[in-house]
Amino acid sequence: MAGLQRLASHLPVGVMLPHNTTEAPGPHSAKQDSYEQGDSSQQSLKGHLRNNFQKQLLSNKELTLDKVYTHPKWNTHTKARSYSYPHCTGISQQDPESDSQGQGKGLFYSSGPQSWYPKANNQDFIPFTKKRVGVDRAYPLKPVVHRKSCSTGEAGTDGYHNVYPRPPEPREFSSRNFGVRNQGNFSVVGTVLAAMQAEKAVANFDRTEWVQIRRLEAAGESLEEEIRRKQILLRGKLKKTEEELRRIQMQKEQAKENENRELQKIILPRSRVKGNNSNTMYKPIFSPEFEFEEEFSRDRREDETWGRSQQNSSPFQLSDYRIQRLKRERLVASNNKIQDRVSELSVEKFSLPSETPGGALQGSARNSSLSMAPDSSGSSGSIEEPQLG
């Protein structure tokens, strides 16, 4: 008995121990002790084996279900398991005499960390798998068929039939198939999402392109407006410059006209004064001079027009035109000489006034000789002309 008490002190609370022989004396006490000792050793070995097997099964199930999806009822079941430990220990502590009755009814208390399990019925274990499988998420309206578990009449009084848990039902395979089907659905959903994302990306790209096009169009419109504005400004500047040039030309023309008028006003009074102050002897000298200049200018203009019109004429006409031109040049040279002599005589007359009548006679003689000089020069010119011809 001392040895049994020591074992009881080391063992956990939920382990079954044989009853004390002192409390139940009888004629068959030795046989009963040996039977109880053998029964306790067998129960401890079977409990350890069952616990190890259940741990392996639970770990495999957890791995498979974690791979497929996380079920919300998993946490609730683990909580129920955690809550079952103190409850079972409390029952074993409060009612030690009911251990034998529990064994008779099929209950079994393990010495490991697992909670107590009913020996005769495994219905608490089977619905756990059903709950973990749950409803198919792809088809939520599909009716769920719960398979009936084994009948409760399998529980025997000997307490050795349902010690080991039942093998995994085909529901686990259905859950695996469900995971594969979910993977297929996820692949379809992934393709749909990828297509939607591609459409969104294309839409965003089109939107960005449209925004860039609008910006470029706005920039082009602004540039066109600036070009138009600059063109208008340049046109205004050109008009102003043209008006200024016209005004400058008009001013120049007016200035030239005014200068010509002033020159005419200055020349005409001098000619009149000279005509009034000069003697009658000088009139035939000055009058033919001005007439000759006018005639020469007129002939020169006609010569220019005739030369332009007769550029493509015959060589005989050109030779006649050259002869006439030489004659006119000689006449101009003789006229210039006469003008020089007249100017010299006029200067001498105003510088040295005549004091004696003899001087006047000499001056008249000189004038007569000068008047005869142009006649002689004209005669000589007339004589030389046929020689040239």
UniProtKB/Swiss-Prot annotation:
Full protein name: Zinc finger C2HC domain-containing protein 1C homolog
Record's keyword annotation contains Iron-sulfur: no
Residue ranges of the TM segments: none
Family classification: Belongs to the ZC2HC1 family.
Sequence ranges of Low complexity compositional bias: 368-382
Keywords: Coiled coil
Keyword Coiled coil listed: yes
Listed Polar residues bias regions: 35-44, 90-102, 307-317
InterPro entries (UniProt xref): ZNF_C2HC_dom_1C
